[in-house]
Amino acid sequence: MAAPLKGFLETTSDLWLSGAMIDKPAAVFASASSLHGGHEAVLQSMMTPLLHHGMLVMGCPYSDPGLAMTEGGGTPYGPTHLDADSLRPHEEAMAHRLGQRLAKWSQHV
């Protein structure tokens, strides 16, 4: 996880203690400089504090066609971008679909 994000999350103790984020939907996304550059580990490290907050973390279901692509980013934990190149169409589409799911569930809370 990037240091600025970690620093921000460390300032959310009051929200955690008050339970203000419980049942709020959340999702994560990331980029890495190589295909096996730790995409999953980065996403999981970002999910941990969200789960501690009691948030409802969603990822990309295996029905997402982007997960079948092997030449770029994308994991069940969230969309990723292989930043060695420009954004690939399937990476952008996965991020858009996850954003749509997040927006849909946000209307219910």
Where are these regions (language model features)?
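Helix-loop-strand module that forms the ligand-binding subsite of alpha/beta enzymes
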Residues: 1-65
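Glycine-rich phosphate/pyrophosphate-binding loop and the adjoining helix
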Residues: 56-109
